């Protein structure tokens, strides 16, 4: 069995190149059909995210001497389906085969090859890619091979083990996630809290998604452009818990908020100490977390001097993130050990699986020979031939037929000097080979 991965990622290609080789769901189906039609592989899985595009090929019958030319054909196809030349992808496109390809897949699924080390979303994306291919091949009445299916199932279990046994995903390494982690440290639960988000950019969107996943009771989004905030809400799951405010309603939002996270491009302060004092009075001095991730600042620095106020800036978050990155690097080293162990385990299984198929085929072939010769012998007996002569002929033909292939193998071993193989044959015959 030969496994090949070809692709590009954020380490090898710019956004401009990555955009050109992205696969939509429809284009993935078209690509899988082309791979079949051109006999490039028996099965394939296509992973396409904002940071990587990779195609995993599986072929049972690529001889080692043809592996290089097969890889070249797959790379040429990859360029052509995106209407690019290979020269346009020079230095961007990479390939790995067999053990290195499996190690690469496991690293990707565990988040070790991600832009944000250890990010969990990639595992779901690999699962989605696998499911799409599985459904495609089922629709063609050609299910994914047991070997390829086993590889992806093994990869998913490896990722789960890495998440369980290491702290690869336990420390915030993005500003949005860091802000949410701070909130979870300060408050026992987010489910009864009101959150005010100021701004409607990418960081606020990511923060909002994190908060919704953790079951925040209510989110208010205040933005200078009301329509942009409304558009953001339409992209969210759980939007029924999200309310849009005009920036003129900022004080109203502060008065209700347990958590305030601000990230705008405003050149001036938006939230002053006096505004927070008013909010404290309205909230009966309940604890309040304010996280300012804007540059320049959105929240007046002196806010942190007030009682019951937890105030953090983007610099505070960066310090936390850098510390957490060090922890994730340690965890990634532990994860790599697990991946190498599990990769070796997969190839052990593959070896046994392939030889069990060989043994089964050999025994089925022997049974076919037995049935053919037996039918001929029974026919001869029914036609009145001497039974002893028929049995002698049956045993002679059966012996010759069954020993023909093993004899050829032993002759080949003698010619190549394969003493180990000859010794194994010898042990089964309980005789010495000189």
UniProtKB/Swiss-Prot annotation:
User: Which domain of life does this protein belong to?
Assistant: Bacteria
Write out the pathway annotation from the protein's UniProt entry. Porphyrin-containing compound metabolism; protoporphyrin-IX biosynthesis; 5-aminolevulinate from L-glutamyl-tRNA(Glu): step 1/2
Asked if the keyword Ribosomal protein belongs to this entry, the reply reads: no
Q: Site annotated as Important for activity: where?
A: 104
What is an annotated GO biological process for this record, any one?
protoporphyrinogen IX biosynthetic process from glutamate
Domain text from the record? Possesses an unusual extended V-shaped dimeric structure with each monomer consisting of three distinct domains arranged along a curved 'spinal' alpha-helix. The N-terminal catalytic domain specifically recognizes the glutamate moiety of the substrate. The second domain is the NADPH-binding domain, and the third C-terminal domain is responsible for dimerization.
- Family membership, please give it: Belongs to the glutamyl-tRNA reductase family.
Q: What is this protein called?
A: Glutamyl-tRNA reductase
């Amino acid at each position: 069995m030969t496994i090949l991965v070809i692709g590009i990622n954020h380490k090898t290609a710019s956004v401009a190149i990555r955009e050109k080789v992205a696969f939509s769901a429809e284009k993935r189906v078209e690509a899988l059909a082309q791979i079949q039609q051109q006999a490039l592989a028996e099965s394939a899985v296509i992973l396409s995210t904002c940071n990587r595009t990779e195609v995993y090929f599986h072929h049972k019958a690529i001889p080692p001497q043809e592996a290089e030319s097969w890889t070249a054909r797959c790379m040429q196809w990859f360029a052509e389906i995106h209407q690019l030349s290979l020269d346009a992808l020079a230095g961007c496109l990479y390939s790995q085969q067999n053990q290195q390809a499996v190690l690469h897949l496991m690293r990707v699924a565990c988040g070790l090859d991600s832009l944000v080390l250890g990010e969990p979303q990639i595992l779901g994306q690999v699962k989605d890619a696998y499911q799409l291919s599985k459904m495609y091949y089922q629709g063609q009445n050609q299910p994914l091979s047991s070997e390829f299916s086993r590889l992806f199932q093994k990869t998913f279990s490896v990722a789960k083990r890495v998440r369980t046994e290491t702290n690869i995903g336990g420390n915030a390494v993005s500003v949005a996630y860091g802000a949410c982690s701070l909130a979870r440290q300060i408050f026992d639960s987010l489910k009864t809290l009101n959150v005010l988000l100021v701004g409607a950019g990418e960081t606020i969107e990511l923060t909002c998604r994190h908060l919704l996943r953790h079951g925040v009771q209510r989110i208010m989004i205040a933005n200078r452009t009301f329509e942009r905030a409304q558009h953001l809400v339409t992209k969210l799951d759980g939007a029924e818990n999200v309310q849009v405010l005009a920036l003129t309603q900022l004080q109203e939002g502060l008065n209700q908020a347990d958590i305030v996270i601000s990230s705008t491009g405003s050149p001036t302060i938006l939230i002053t100490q006096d505004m927070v004092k008013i909010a404290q009075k309205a909230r009966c001095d309940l604890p309040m977390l304010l996280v300012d991730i804007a540059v320049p600042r959105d929240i007046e620095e002196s806010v942190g001097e007030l009682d019951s106020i937890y105030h953090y800036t983007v610099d505070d978050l960066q310090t936390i993130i850098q510390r957490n990155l060090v922890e994730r690097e340690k965890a990634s080293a532990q994860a790599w050990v697990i991946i190498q162990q599990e990769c070796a385990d997969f190839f052990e299984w593959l070896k046994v699986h392939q030889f069990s198929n060989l043994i089964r085929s050999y025994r089925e072939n022997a049974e076919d020979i037995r049935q053919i010769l037996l039918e001929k012998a029974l026919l001869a007996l029914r036609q009145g031939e001497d039974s002893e002569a028929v049995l002698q002929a049956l045993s002679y033909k059966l012996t010759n037929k069954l020993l023909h292939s093993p004899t050829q193998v032993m002759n080949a071993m003698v010619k190549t000097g394969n003493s180990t193989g000859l010794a194994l044959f010898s042990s089964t015959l309980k005789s010495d080979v000189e």
